[in-house]
Amino acid sequence: NVDDPGIIHDADTPEDYAELLRAHNQSLIRSEIHIQLAREKVFFDEQLYSLLTLIQETGSVRDACEHMHISYSTSWNLIRTLESQLHKPLVSRSQGGVNGSHSELTPYGEEFLKRYARFSEETRNCSEKIFENCFRGFFNA
């Protein structure tokens, strides 16, 4: 008696294959870690990491907001809260002019993002190892 649907069922059509893939993916269990930084309250999370990364890539807070579907005022509130918690500016702003306004991360902001990315990656790697040690073979039993 075989319990593997990949052996029992044909995958001759795209629909059959899609169903097998759906069943396989549904059977995968993994841990999910969300990294946040806090003092009394959370002041930095993955959403703000994405916002700052987009500001650096686009050179524009407004463009970053459009990509993330958040309001311009919300983004500035998040940035101001972060900067007040770290006591340093992370985003430098230049006003209008011929080429319009421009924003970019300060050197401190760039270093902060690098360190957060490293911390996040190392935390996820440790979490995966711990998850594997705690649950290896458990869900397949």
Residue ranges and their predicted role:
Residues 93-118:
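Basic, amphipathic "hinge/linker" alpha-helix immediately C-terminal to the N-terminal HTH DNA-binding motif
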Residues 27-40:
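Short, Lys/Arg-enriched N-terminal segment that forms or immediately precedes the first helix
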Residues 1-30:
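Conserved alpha/beta core of the MobA/IspD/sugar-nucleotide pyrophosphorylase nucleotidyltransferase superfamily
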Residues 58-64:
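Short helix-boundary/capping micro-motifs
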Residues 78:
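Residues within the DNA-recognition helix of helix-turn-helix
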Residues 110-141:
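Helix-turn-helix/homeodomain-like alpha-helical modules used for DNA recognition
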